[in-house]
């Protein structure tokens, strides 16, 4: 699991990971402001809520486990929630990096244009078999899977419109990449 790889990286570099709900992203640097929120809520024996952290950080990394997850976030049912998170970041001055882990040799948004979504092949095979009167017990998804070209165009639009930045890496490099994007050691990363 990719979160296991990240956690191993953090542990091997003596980084403590505190679990808390965040309004934007999955990872932030625990600044003095963040620590103050945690301390005050703990002193009052209150549960931390996402919005408690608004105004306490200005860089966040949201991680995606693969290309399918980001395709669903941008071009699928999860789009409204993902878009709202991007707008929330923009409205609160938070630089949001979306780190997409993948083994598809995608290293930039430009690479996404030529990314081949394996779900397209399955969709096309089922559609073809249906024309032959076969596999009729296998239903065809209502919408065709997202192509790399459509996904890349949507990413570029979101970058321009909301200031979100899409970054790519292999799963085994994700831990180091998260720290790099958060600002590394000069921001308390290492």
What are these model-derived regions, one by one?
Residues 16-21, 28-190:
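Extended, alpha-helix-rich binding/interface surfaces that flank or overlap catalytic cores
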Residues 10-12:
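Short, solvent-exposed amphipathic alpha-helical segments in soluble enzyme
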